[in-house]
Amino acid sequence: MRVLGFLSSHAGTGTAAAHTRWRWLAPLGIQAIRPASASAGGNAVSSATPQAPPCPIHANVGVGRASALGPGPSGFMAPSAGIVTAIRDGPNSNSRCSTVRTHATRSKSTGPSRATSSGPATAAPPRRRRRTSNDTQDGGLTSEQTPTNTAVAAVAATAAAAAGASASAAAPALPVALNPTWRTPPTAEAARRITQAASASAAYSGSSAAAAAAAVAAGPSSAASVARGGSAAAARSAAASALAANANTSSGAASAAAIAATASTAPGKLLLGGDLSRALAAAGSTTAPPLPLPSRAGLSAPKHTASAAAAAAAAASVLPASTPAAASQTPPTTVTSCGTGSGAPATPRAARSPTAAVSVSSADAAAAAAAAAAPASAAATAAAAVLPTRHIVAAVDPDLNGALALIYWDEDPNDPTTATASGPAAATTDAAAAAAAAAAAATGPAARLATLAAAAPPGSGAAAAADEAAAAALLWLPTPPRPPADASRWRVCVWDMPVSAAERQKRTASGQVARRRLLHVAGARAVLSAALAAALPPPGEARPVALYGYVEVPPILPGDGNIAAYTSLWSTGSWLGLLTGMGFTVGSTPVRRWKTDLGLYGAKGKDASLALARALFPGQQPILRHKKNHGRADALLIAAWALGACLPRGLGASLRRNGITLDQLLQQQPGTTVGLVWGPPRPPAPTDAYGNLLTPEQDMWDEIEAAETKVERKAQARSSTARRRKTAGTQEEPEAQAEEEQAEAGTGVVAAAAGAAAPKRRRAKKAAVESGSEAAVAEVAAGPQEEGSEGEVAGQGGRACRSKSRSKSSGKSSSKAEAGGAGSGRRRAASVGSSSVGSSSVGSSSGGGGGGGGGVKAPGASRRRGGAKAGSDGGVSGSESE
């Protein structure tokens, strides 16, 4: 890869200074061209014409300071626009794309030769380096992997010949299809589950896309549209142009409202009115009959489903058959089409889903579906009316300043350079998988991890990847094909992100009203619906549709606040749900992954992404003028990354090794633009924000069975607990009743004994006490004896209650509480009774003594008023003291 800046000749003034200026590019492996001499005026334009037209498949487009090109077969002149094209060289490049070295600088080349400033290129052994995702020219293939890839291709070709796929074997062999190098390699079980989930997603995508096309085709006035075919097409084109104008000139919620208002008069108003969801729900009646799930050996090969073709045939049965002119008619342009011929031709097919039967083409499936529902003539008409598949790739930058980029194109089955990622050169590990991949070559693109043969040389590093290769043989993910080489056949749409704002009570430091911005979900749905209405085939075209969605998933960094993290997750989750609900096969795109592949990871600003987007999509330069348009640039670059765009060979590794980012390169050399090369497309893989492949923990049916088993287990546990409690209650009730009866009987016996033993209180008459009769004296003398007997009875009652409470401690808690309460109450009653009896006897004796002896104060004199009045001599002093 050469960065073309100033052009120079080998002779002239300023050569040494220019060589010193561009010498810093040598460690990066970038071939630079010196500035022109002063005699040429510094802006010399070469008059040489290219000897052969450039090959757009391997073209790198960039903008240099000078609008001139050096002579040679590798470039073409574009002085008006200042477009410079550099063709990468390599053993697998096209013969027309050969490159001539115009100048030799001192650099560390990774190729088979090393150029020095003092002499010609000398042969040098290839340097061994670590493989990175899409870091080499052919999708991550290093020089030491070439024999292995050749052997794998030979094994696959042999299996294809054995399977009878002569058409696939005749296709030109491509290098091993590269897929992302996962951060966490999947196991065999994980690969099987991911494949099953991806197959179900692809089947849903195919059926939902067919239903959406049928919903657009079967509008409220289908009969009128049949009668007015030309006027309806003109109205659709005008509506699409208005949608494009609104998408490019407006922003935010106003753009969403304008899009919704314009699309309400377009054929896609069914999508805005909610009929798309009902159409998707009704799409089950048009899908093919369910087939048994595939085995593990057959999961590596994708198969077709007749859902899209059947829906297309059903739409064609009610709409007029397409004429050749209508079939060749290009779809309406929503936004300025991309002018760079930067794609590779491919022949993708309709959406797939795995089946156990042999795969069939979409035309055969459409013919079979039509034959089952209509006469033979109608079946032939429907089969002839089925057009090539339309592939729609949606890329979303979910940032509030982001955008939605949509790229769609129609396949060309007559292209002689047709080749898919699952062709004869696909890497496999055994003959059965190779035969399955070769048989599936005619069904459409399918991405698999780059696996190596088990018989690879030990030095190639393939032996260490045997486990990963065995697991990757089962992994299949739906992948979009390469866009066509003709840039006029694919369209690019850009839609700004609809944002809503809520005012907060807290004001900013400057006194302004603080607003919290958030994605407007309804506006995002309106934007996506309008984009689909513009990209889906118009009514009258029985064309299958394949949908692929890529959503950037930013990681949550430690320095992010709660509001920032919530806003990011809200937007990302909303777009994932919207794309999935619309029928897209959605995958996560980690920020670090796609920016590393494009050389933007670690960039401080947005100038590098804007420059890359302008160079890659020159037709979108009017909407990429300002720095605030970096969201549109990121969305376009994500779409390009999904279609296989990457840095040139070795440039990304050189930048990382030297600690230089692409934005720093552009800042140091403002007139330098590094172009991108196109490799195999990348599948919409289910990954997290860090590139880890998300694996379903269990299969779908296993999860359902596990949930049902869990519910049954909980119900059984509840019923067994209830039975156990009921049984324990029935056994404890008789024992508790017996204990209660025994306790009551014991309490009654003790109370009766206490009542019989306790003497009754004698009430002395006031006159007898005052007179100091012999009866009062006898009562005072009998007081201590009665007090002793009462204390003995109270002690017996207390001991009986304590023994009774100890016997009940082994019973139920409720019985124990009742028994304890009764015992404590009885103990308190007995103690209170004994104390009252004792105090009365002591008071009587003290009163009698006071009456007889007079003047002697007894302890019980203050408690008995009668004792205080007893003494004639000392009674007065006693009453006064009281």
UniProtKB/Swiss-Prot annotation:
PANTHER family: HOLLIDAY JUNCTION RESOLVASE MOC1, CHLOROPLASTIC-RELATED (PTHR36015:SF6). InterPro entries: MOC1-like. Its EC number is 3.1.21.10. GO terms for molecular function: crossover junction DNA endonuclease activity; DNA binding; metal ion binding. This is Holliday junction resolvase MOC1, chloroplastic. The gene is MOC1. Residues 87-148, 323-351, 710-882 are annotated as: Disordered. One of its GO terms (cellular component) is chloroplast. Keywords: Chloroplast, DNA recombination, DNA-binding, Endonuclease, Hydrolase, Magnesium, Manganese, Metal-binding, Nuclease, Plastid, Transit peptide. The keyword Oxidoreductase does not apply.
